[in-house]
C-alpha cells in the first residue's frame, strides 16, 4: 500500500518519478480500510527535501499511511516557501486533541546549540509529553534523539569535538528483535552530527534495548521495551547527495569540515558518491511501521492502549 498525502504536495510528482507508490487523498478515499495516521514533526530547514526523504521510506510498506506534517517554528523560513508551509503543515494546536498511530520527529541542525537556546524547545517538550497519551509509537531521528533522551531520561547533551560525518559500519546486536528483523549482521548507514551517544551511558541511565551500534558512531538504534519510543541516531533517510551538500555548505561557511568518511570515491569530493544504505533504511522503516505501530495500535484511535507485552 502507498503513503497517502494531499494531491498538491510536491512530493507526489517527485516520488512518482522514482516509481514510488504515492496515493493522493482523492483516490485514497475510495478504499475502505483505515490507514495508519502518522504525524511527521519536520525540524529540518529544507522541509520539502526532508519530506521527500521520509515519504520515500514510508511508502515501501504494504500498509496505507496517512501523513500529517507538523511544524513548531513560527519564524519565517529561509529555505521553504511560506505558501508551502501554510498549505501542507499544521500547528500543534490543530492536532493536540487527536490521536495518531505514529510520530516521527526529524533531526535539526542544532548540534552545537544548548537546549535552552533552541527557540522552540518548550514546544518540543510539550509535544513529547503529549505523545505519551496520544501516539502509539514515536520514532526520533538524530538531533531529536538527543532532545528526547534529555526530556524523557534526563541525559545531558553530549557533544563530540569533531563532527561525525560519513558512512559508517554498524553491527546488529539483537537480530531477533522485531525492529531489526531481516537486518544484515553488519550494514552501512549515514551519520551527520556533533551529538554523541555512548552505549555505556545509555546502559547506565536508561532501560532502553540497544539493538544496533557502531564502533565509530556509538549507539545507532535503540528502543523502549514497550515499543512506545524508538531512536535512530543516524540518517537512513538521506539522499545519495545529502552529505555532499552539507559538506559544500560547511566549506562555503569557512568551517573547514572534514571530508565525509567512506562517502566520496577515493575521498575525492569532485566524484559522485553512491548510496550504500537504501535497503537498510527501507527495512528499518517498514519494521517500525509494522511491528511498533500497526501490530499494537488500536483500530479505533479514540481508545488508545499502545502497549505490547
Swiss-Prot record:
The keyword Cell cycle does not apply. Its EC number is 2.3.1.46. It catalyses: L-homoserine + succinyl-CoA = O-succinyl-L-homoserine + CoA. Pathway: Amino-acid biosynthesis; L-methionine biosynthesis via de novo pathway; O-succinyl-L-homoserine from L-homoserine: step 1/1. The record marks 111 as: Important for acyl-CoA specificity. The active site is at residues 142, 235, 237. GO terms for molecular function: homoserine O-acetyltransferase activity; homoserine O-succinyltransferase activity. GO terms for biological process: L-methionine biosynthetic process from homoserine via O-succinyl-L-homoserine and cystathionine. Keywords: Acyltransferase, Amino-acid biosynthesis, Cytoplasm, Methionine biosynthesis, Transferase. It holds the Pfam family HTS. GO terms for cellular component: cytoplasm. The record marks 192 as: Important for substrate specificity. Substrate binds at residues 163, 192, 249. It is found in: Cytoplasm. InterPro entries: Class_I_gatase-like, HST_MetA, MetA_family. NCBIfam families: metA (TIGR01001). Transfers a succinyl group from succinyl-CoA to L-homoserine, forming succinyl-L-homoserine. HAMAP family: MetA_acyltransf. Belongs to the MetA family. This is Homoserine O-succinyltransferase. It comes from Yersinia pestis. The gene is metAS.
